[in-house]
Design a protein with these regions (language model features):
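Conserved short histidine dyad/triad with adjacent acidic residue
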Residues: 31-49
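Structural motif
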Residues: 59-61, 86, 102-104
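Short acidic-glycine-tyrosine-enriched beta hairpin
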Residues: 67-91
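His/acidic/aromatic-lined binding-pocket segments of jelly-roll/cupin-type domains
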Residues: 44, 50-56, 79, 96-97
């Protein structure tokens, strides 16, 4: 459910480091998210949209669970993310982020979220 994306290359020299983060997909929307400590974000799923999260700063607990017929199903998966971590969330995976520290990340989406008809769906049960 929470797919860790590994670097596809890393080069280091006297100038510093250069890392390849993402070399797949057709991504349509990029967002910068800054969140204070002890805040919950998300707790929703998408029917069509894939999302990548690139953690730039802080520590974030992400919880995920599959959705079937608008209900949480199966085991809950939880990961602690820190600076440099990159994850992929597929459609029909409810995902909730809880910031353990003041955090900043880039959110990359495969679809543009339309204000009049967003691909954001919520359920009544809480993951956190």
């Amino acid at each position: 459910m929470i797919q860790i994306i590994k670097r596809y290359f890393t080069d280091r020299d006297e100038r510093g480091k250069f890392e390849g983060l993402i070399n797949f997909g057709n991504w349509r929307e990029f967002n910068l998210v800054e969140t204070n400590a002890n805040v919950t974000r998300g707790n929703h799923y998408h029917k069509k949209t894939k999302e990548i999260f690139i953690i730039l700063k802080g520590v974030v607990k992400v919880t995920a669970q599959n959705i079937v017929k608008n209900k949480l199903t199966g085991d809950t998966e939880e990961k602690i993310l820190k600076k440099g971590d990159v994850i992929l969330i597929e459609p029909y995976v409810n995902h909730t982020f809880y910031t353990l520290d003041k955090s900043k990340w880039i959110n990359v989406l495969s679809q543009i979220i339309q204000k009049d008809s967003p691909d954001i769906h919520r359920i009544k049960e809480n993951l956190i």
